[in-house]
Amino acid sequence: MDVLHSRLLVSRFAECFRFYDAVLPQLAGAVRTGGTEAGPYAGWDVGEEGVLRLFDRGALAAVVGTAELPADAPVQDRAMLVSRVADVDAGFELCLRHGGRPAAPPTSRPEWGPGMRTAHLRDPDGNLIELQSY
């Protein structure tokens, strides 16, 4: 049973699908359980647990009655996907090769915790991702 998993609402579904379909198996051992780049929905699991779902933002906006509102506004990030990985540098390069955009390069952060290393990037739709190891 999935107690809680992330569902990203994306405007650039096909690009995001290709990005996550390329990086989630290597970063998290996730397997795609449904969906195609045609959308409007796709999901990846590790074992029986949901890891990530993508849903077309416009399709959900039509369901919940917000289609007339702007999809994007200039604000600071409100959420971040975080993935613990064995090698932050390799994970960062993997994500960049598949369409991720750098936000902050791999950096050791001892002030955050012993052995902590992080990198920050954005998926093709602009969602913030942190890769971390410790």
Where are these regions (language model features)?
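Short beta->alpha transition motifs characteristic of CBS
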Residues: R57, G113-P114, H120, L131-Y134
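Active-site beta-strand termini and strand-to-loop segments that position acidic
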Residues: G43-E48, L121-P124, Y134
